[in-house]
Amino acid sequence: MDDLLGYLLLPATLLGITAIAAMGLQLILGGAGLLTLGHSAFFALGGYASAAWVIYVAVPAGLTQPQLLLASGLLIGMGTAALAATVVAWPCLRLRGDYLAAATLACGQIAETCANNLDSVGGASGFTQIPRLCGLPSVALCAVVVAAGLWRLYGTGLGQAVLCARDDELVAQCYGINPARARLAAFVIGSTVTGLAGALSAHAFEFISPTAAGFQRSVELLLAVVVGGMDSLLGSCLGATLLILLPELLRFVPGPAAVVLDWAVALGLPAGVAQVALAALQNSVFLFALVVLLLLRRQPGGLVALWPAQRRRASA
């Protein structure tokens, strides 16, 4: 039983962290309608800044309480991500569509390059020996707080301004809304939440590397939001769940598949076809992509469209 709990602890913690980062991106992508391909930069900034603060400042200054170290580290990580998002947003948010996506992608590549070349934070080998200050309970608590906070934000004047600016800038201006400021606020808040996820990741897994700022991480977060449903915070959490748990489940496919294909060969299936099928089923990336494509083909609105309340709302 202990082995099972230990096996589930890592993916559960990773799921919570990914859900937090995805909810931050949902505010930007689904709420403000801004396509960003470099969002992982803020995840990495939050993690690196928090770890550097704890190792190089807080501990040498005599701060030893784990709770205070974690709280201060999370605040530093979030603050760094917020500051970076503000600096990035002023030039980038003047762009639209593909140009904005390309600009944010460049920011992500810059962050990854800087992390690779800074020896003080481990360089290409990654930042190691980070104190483990949090685990699943802390991550779960932060995920609940973030979900409640963002849900409440959508009900405020700022949240409504963000949605109105996304839907129609002219109408937003008629209501006295400044679309640029609304988008800026959404971008900074969403990036700050993602910075929190990065800080939690660094202190939960005691490690962070430049790949945290890489394009693959940005695509994973984007995939979680799109697959789950861009218009819903719940969708982001469901997408993060699929993103983390599906690869774990697909690891158990090749064994039974090999037995079934052996039976099929005995019944007359050509051996070459069986070998190709087995090779495909042993490729977890291929299986994951296939499942995602089939899901989006069946449910373009994402996983959240399967939720009973969402289905009743759509049919009303």
Predicted regions mapped to residue ranges:
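Transmembrane alpha-helices and adjacent helix-loop boundaries
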Residues: 1-316
